[in-house]
């Protein structure tokens, strides 16, 4: 039995864990307090590993980033960044239009307040930026961690190849630890689902359904409205034939593999059939699999604002704009590990003074809905890589 279960995919295990958790909560509610330990251990593991994960992944990706390989790379990168920003803005609008409530353990955290003005926000950001790096990691100050990782990464871009390789090896080692933690997800989710449904009942299903609807709806909006607008402006023509071709031949494959990296060969093959210059595609598509994460920006923004709404924190427009920028920067590091967008939610939550403990509960909620969320997110991310690459190549041929 255990051997059969070990051969199942993580998605299948999570689905089984959710079903078992709901069943135990409805049939044996008196047992659920004993199952809470599984969920607590899972959240504690995520909370412990997240700071070093963010630091190492961002530092390694920036230190090893190479530019100048192709004349067409700059406009592709511009599309990547603009696309992620617009995706984050769309997520803000969707979250305001359809606010979601999460079931969180907020005992002793009811005094949370957002900064009162833009000046307060910028002051808090600056103070977080210049935090002691060791203290930032130990206290899970994700803004400080991000600042030091970016700064050191930029400084190490001129270091030797050996040093860069060491950083890459450390990044792979941290990712391996994360994979072990994620492998424990079905057990942790089983405990979390059982306790949540025992406490809140079937109303939890409605909450998760609305959260999923906002997430998936926003991603579809980005895929079918935002991306076509950007591509249309680039190629100065009807974008939808190219959009649908990329969604069909790249997005569907990525939906089931749930890995942008695994979908790189599919995208390179599609780019070749679309007549894209190989010197452009060979750089921009692997680069896109690393930094182009519009779906991750949506996930980070929606779940952060759902947390803010749940805790009753008032936020203004300026804060939301800053959140969109932070979500975009965070999304660039989301490719380092499975479920990376979820593990970077604490970075955005820290903008609102939300503790790491609560943020990790939100990550756990994200794990529960990740069966659909992660697949759709990957489909959007990966199909956008080849879409924007092809669009820039078409524009280049038009100008030549």
Swiss-Prot record:
Pfam families: SDF (PF00375). The keyword Transferase does not apply. GO terms for cellular component: plasma membrane. Its main location: membrane. It is found in: Cell inner membrane. Keywords: Amino-acid transport, Cell inner membrane, Cell membrane, Membrane, Symport, Transmembrane, Transmembrane helix, Transport. One of its GO terms (molecular function) is amino acid transmembrane transporter activity. GO terms for biological process: serine transport; threonine transport. The chain crosses the membrane at residues 14-34, 48-68, 76-96, 136-156, 177-197, 211-231, 285-305, 311-331, 349-371. It comes from the Bacteria. InterPro entries: Na-dicarboxylate_symporter, Na:dicarbo_symporter_sf, Ser_Thr_transp_SstT. Involved in the import of serine and threonine into the cell, with the concomitant import of sodium (symport system). This is Serine/threonine transporter SstT. It comes from Acinetobacter baumannii (strain ATCC 17978 / DSM 105126 / CIP 53.77 / LMG 1025 / NCDC KC755 / 5377). The gene is sstT.
């Amino acid at each position: 039995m255990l051997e059969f279960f070990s051969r199942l995919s993580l998605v299948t295990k999570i689905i089984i864990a959710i079903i078992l958790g709901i069943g135990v909560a409805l049939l044996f509610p008196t047992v659920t307090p004993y199952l809470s330990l599984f969920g607590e251990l899972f959240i504690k593991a995520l909370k412990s590993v997240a700071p070093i994960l963010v630091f190492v992944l961002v530092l390694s990706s920036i230190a090893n980033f190479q530019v100048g390989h192709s004349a067409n790379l700059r406009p592709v990168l511009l599309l990547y960044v603009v696309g992620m920003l617009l995706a984050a803005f769309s997520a803000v609008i969707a979250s305001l239009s359809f606010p979601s409530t999460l079931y969180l353990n907020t005992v002793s955290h009811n005094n949370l307040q957002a900064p009162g003005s833009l000046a307060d926000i910028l002051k808090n950001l600056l103070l977080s930026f210049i935090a002691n790096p060791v203290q930032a990691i130990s206290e899970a100050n994700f803004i400080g961690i991000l600042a030091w990782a970016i700064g050191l990464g930029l400084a190490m871009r001129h270091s030797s190849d050996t040093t860069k390789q060491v950083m890459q090896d450390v990044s792979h080692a941290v990712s391996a630890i994360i994979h072990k933690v994620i492998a424990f997800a079905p057990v942790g989710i089983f405990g979390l689902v059982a306790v949540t449904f025992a406490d809140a009942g079937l109303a939890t299903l409605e909450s998760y359904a609305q959260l999923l609807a906002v997430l998936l709806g926003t991603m579809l909006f980005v895929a079918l409205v935002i991306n076509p607008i950007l591509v249309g402006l680039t190629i100065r023509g009807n974008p939808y034939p190219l959009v649908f071709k990329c969604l069909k031949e790249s997005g569907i494959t990525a939906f089931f593999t749930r890995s942008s990296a695994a979908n790189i060969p599919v995208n390179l093959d599609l780019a070749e059939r679309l007549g894209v210059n190989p010197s452009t595609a060979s750089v921009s598509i692997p680069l896109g699999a690393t930094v182009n994460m519009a779906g991750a920006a949506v996930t980070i923004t929606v779940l952060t604002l759902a947390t803010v709404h749940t805790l009753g924190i008032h936020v203004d427009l300026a804060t939301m704009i800053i959140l969109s920028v932070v979500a975009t920067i965070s999304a660039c590091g989301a490719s380092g590990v499975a479920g990376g967008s979820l593990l970077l939610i604490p970075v955005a939550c820290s903008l609102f003074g939300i503790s790491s403990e609560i943020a990790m509960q939100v990550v756990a909620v994200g794990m529960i809905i990740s069966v659909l969320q992660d697949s759709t997110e990957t489909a959007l991310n990966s199909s956008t890589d080849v879409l924007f690459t092809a669009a820039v190549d078409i524009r280049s041929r038009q100008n030549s």
